[in-house]
From Swiss-Prot:
NCBIfam families: PRK13674.1-1. The keyword Ion transport does not apply. PANTHER family: GTP CYCLOHYDROLASE MPTA. The gene is folE2. Keywords: Hydrolase. The record marks C183 as: May be catalytically important. It catalyses: GTP + H2O = 7,8-dihydroneopterin 3'-triphosphate + formate + H(+). This is GTP cyclohydrolase FolE2. InterPro entries: GTP_cyclohydrolase_FolE2, GTP_cyclohydrolase_FolE2/MptA.
Amino acid sequence: MTEARPVATERAYPALSREYPADFRVDDSYKASLPDLQNGPASLIVGARAPIQHVGISNFRLPIRYQTQEGGEIALETSVTGTVSLEADRKGINMSRIMRSFYAHAEKQFSMGVLEAALEDYKSDLGSFDARIMMRLSYPMRVESLRSGLSGWQYYDIALELSERAGQRLRIMHFDYVYSSTCPCSLELAEHARQMRGQLATPHSQRSIARISVVMQGDTLWFEDMVTLCRRAVATETQVMVKREDEQAFAELNAANPIFVEDAVRAFAAELMAEPRIGDFRVVASHQESLHSHDAVSVLTQGETFAHASLDPAIFAGLRA
């Protein structure tokens, strides 16, 4: 005969309030009693006791004020990613400190000096050796049409990156430039059909994009400077406001500047090499073909900063013109 199990009583589990205590106030003593697992002992580490190069938060958004090259100011929604290194014998980090450190500087007008101060703060707050901040924004510039006199806003996707590793600090700008590329081969074939057979034919062209990453050195490299540099390299930037005369002008501009993807990355590289405010760089270009069901792509790097034996699998997938 089995023994009867004891009947559970209400005292086995405390009665819990199911109402939110809006009037509850936290004092220092209560805060000191709160558990903090991320700062726990190394015995709590899960998995390999290995150092982590990047741990933090991604895509917290806030408005940041930027100065234009002409001296004006513009507030733009900015997405921020902040990470630090973590030593092998440390359990984790308090990620909210990254946000708090950044917010302490968020009301200031942006400059690389402000960004460096934010980096120093959260590196110090978290007791880390290495740290990185990346800010992503879309920067508007008014662009004139080619012939009609109209103008419209062109937006440039930009990421600013400040990183410190082993005491070496890098200031990097990633800049997306969208342009039209007319295939030189297709242009010649279309002309051949016209001349040899009186056959109307049109060359194929496509929206294309270059992501240009540069190490900034020396004097300020303005966003507007990058736009000017890219336009010198590849003149066929996509248009904003267009009337018929602008569309015709753009067709003429493309015919005057046919370009393969290999030509494009080298044209950008020539301008980047000539700019003393730019050190190492990388150009990733994608011509999103209208003839083929695939894209034509190319990568050109200068210096060690962006040189890798392996390509990120998403390096071209992330380029959507």
